[in-house]
């Protein structure tokens, strides 16, 4: 996360360690020493799976044999790994499925990296790892004050999971604070060294953290504030902007950043996230098996022989093509496929609407007016309109003419001015956005006359 720090809730500050500067200085000195490091063992439930139980379900925390053996359970044969290519293969119902492991997963299996959970317990090894994390966070999150990062990383109420390249090089990590009473944890910092960001460490680290937290605590949710650059990463890791956790549970406990986007992740109880790629393939295999029982789409039929002699091609009845009738095809479907999917004005409407949505004055008009917040609005405004409704209508091909599109846009501005007073900010926002809209339309010669 990289965002300017504006405010931090009092409830989350706690008592600051008085010796934080001393601890940081001592840890910096320890990094220069050549000290053998003892691994911090994770719970036994988090051991790497060598084989997965068959069927449509995958058991949590299952642990396979160290040496793969020939066996078949529920139609799933033992996986075979091509170590050179990093490709994992397994058989399900006689069909081979395979997926490519991330470089970070391969490196962990080869013993080149490890994932270690550390906190400020004043031990030499943990302080060295925490200092390595602090340095990465300070470099990768330049908008955060360095003293603030150091204070939280060394805070004894926080835990960190670090990615360590052996023997002892910290390449990234996540610092988080658990709130077990509320069954959630706050991800405070998350960063990978800039030289290591193409090897899948970020995703693999998050999967390790989810499995570790779920196996050792009663925590079910992650909350974090993400800046614009981090939103994409968190979305890929299962986070969403829709916060379902009750506000009374977390409000006042987590650090609040102005300009950040609050995101939430609910951890599924029956999923082992380190095996997510295999689980998804198993689900696909089970679905394909079910499809084959009710459909004939998997049958490969021979090609048409009429095209072998190109000099004597004759028209054929489509219904005589093997499998076409069984697939449910009709001549009407062919006619429907020939119709254009979008109207002639679609691209222009989409571009104009996108620019409207991104305009600085558009925020009051992005969504419909909340009936609970403004109860009398719909009594006064009989034909409400907003930019999200326009987007839905556009995607559903409900704007046959550009005049209809312009009508709805003007409806937004007129409704706002009709309901709000002339001296209100909403009235001024409507004028600004309307002026921008008119300017964009006048830039398109074939539509500029429609504004008159």
Swiss-Prot record:
Record keywords, A-Z: Activator, Acyltransferase, Bromodomain, Chromatin regulator, Nucleus, Transcription, Transcription regulation, Transferase
Subcellular localization(s) per the UniProt record: Nucleus
Domain named Bromo: residues: 340-444
Span of domain N-acetyltransferase: 113-268
GO MF annotation terms: histone crotonyltransferase activity; histone H3 acetyltransferase activity; histone H3K14 acetyltransferase activity; histone H3K18 acetyltransferase activity; histone H3K9 acetyltransferase activity; histone reader activity; lysine-acetylated histone binding; transcription coregulator activity
InterPro entries linked to this entry: Acyl_CoA_acyltransferase, Bromodomain, Bromodomain-like_sf, Bromodomain_CS, GCN5, GNAT_dom
Residues at which acetyl-CoA binds: 190-192, 197-203, 229-232
Marked site (Important for catalytic activity) residue numbers: 186
Annotated GO CC locations: ADA complex; chromosome, centromeric region; cytosol; histone acetyltransferase complex; nucleus; SAGA complex; SLIK (SAGA-like) complex
Biased composition (Basic residues): 1-10
Superkingdom as given in the UniProt entry: Eukaryota
SMART domains linked: BROMO
Family under the similarity heading: Belongs to the acetyltransferase family. GCN5 subfamily.
Annotated function: Histone acetyltransferase that acetylates histone H2B to form H2BK11ac and H2BK16ac, histone H3 to form H3K14ac, with a lower preference histone H4 to form H4K8ac and H4K16ac, and contributes to H2A.Z acetylation. Acetylation of histones gives a specific tag for epigenetic transcription activation. In addition to histone acetyltransferase, can use different acyl-CoA substrates, such as (2E)-butenoyl-CoA (crotonyl-CoA) and is able to mediate histone crotonylation.
The protein's name in its UniProt record: Histone acetyltransferase GCN5
Organism: Eremothecium gossypii (strain ATCC 10895 / CBS 109.51 / FGSC 9923 / NRRL Y-1056)
Protein's gene: GCN5
């Amino acid at each position: 996360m990289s965002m300017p720090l504006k405010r931090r809730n009092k409830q989350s500050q706690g008592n600051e360690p008085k010796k934080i500067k001393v601890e940081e200085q001592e840890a910096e000195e320890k990094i220069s020493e050549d000290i053998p490091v003892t691994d911090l063992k994770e719970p036994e439930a988090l051991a790497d799976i060598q084989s997965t139980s068959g069927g449509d379900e995958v058991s949590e925390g299952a642990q396979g044999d160290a040496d793969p053996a020939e066996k078949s359970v529920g139609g799933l044969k033992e996986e075979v790994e091509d170590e050179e290519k990093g490709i994992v293969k397994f058989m399900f119902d006689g069909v081979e499925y395979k997926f490519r492991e991330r470089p970070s997963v391969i490196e962990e299996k080869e013993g080149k990296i490890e994932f270690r959970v550390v906190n400020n317990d004043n031990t030499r090894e943990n302080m060295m790892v925490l200092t390595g994390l602090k340095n990465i966070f300070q470099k990768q999150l330049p908008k955060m004050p360095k003293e603030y990062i150091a204070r939280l990383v060394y805070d004894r109420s926080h835990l960190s999971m670090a990615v360590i390249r052996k023997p002892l090089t910290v390449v990234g990590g996540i610092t988080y604070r658990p709130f077990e009473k509320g069954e959630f944890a706050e991800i405070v910092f998350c960063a990978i060294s800039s030289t290591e960001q193409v090897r899948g460490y970020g995703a693999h680290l998050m999967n390790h953290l989810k499995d570790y937290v779920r196996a050792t605590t009663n925590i079910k949710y992650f909350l974090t504030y993400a800046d614009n650059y981090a939103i994409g990463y968190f979305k890929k890791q299962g986070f969403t902007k829709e916060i379902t956790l009750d506000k009374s549970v977390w409000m006042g406990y987590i650090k609040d950043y102005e300009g950040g986007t609050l995101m939430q992740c609910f951890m599924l109880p029956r999923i082992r996230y380190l095996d997510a790629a295999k689980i998804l393939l198993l689900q696909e295999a089970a679905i394909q098996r079910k499809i084959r029982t009710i459909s004939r789409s998997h049958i490969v039929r021979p090609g048409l022989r009429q095209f072998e002699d190109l000099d004597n091609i004759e028209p054929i009845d489509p219904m005589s093509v093997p499998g076409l009738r069984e697939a449910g095809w009709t001549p009407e479907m062919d006619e429907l496929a020939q119709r254009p999917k979008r109207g002639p004005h679609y691209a222009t409407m989409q571009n104009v609407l996108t620019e409207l949505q991104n305009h600085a004055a558009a925020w009051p008009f992005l969504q419909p007016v909340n009936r609970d917040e403004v109860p009398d609005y719909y009594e006064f405004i009989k034909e409400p309109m907003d930019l999200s409704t326009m987007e839905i209508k556009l995607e559903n091909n409900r704007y046959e003419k550009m005049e209809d599109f312009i009508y709805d846009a003007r409806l937004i501005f007129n409704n706002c001015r009709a309901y709000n007073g002339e001296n209100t900010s909403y009235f001024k926002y409507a004028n600004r956005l309307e002026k921008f809209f008119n300017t964009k339309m006048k830039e398109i010669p074939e539509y500029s006359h429609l504004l008159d």
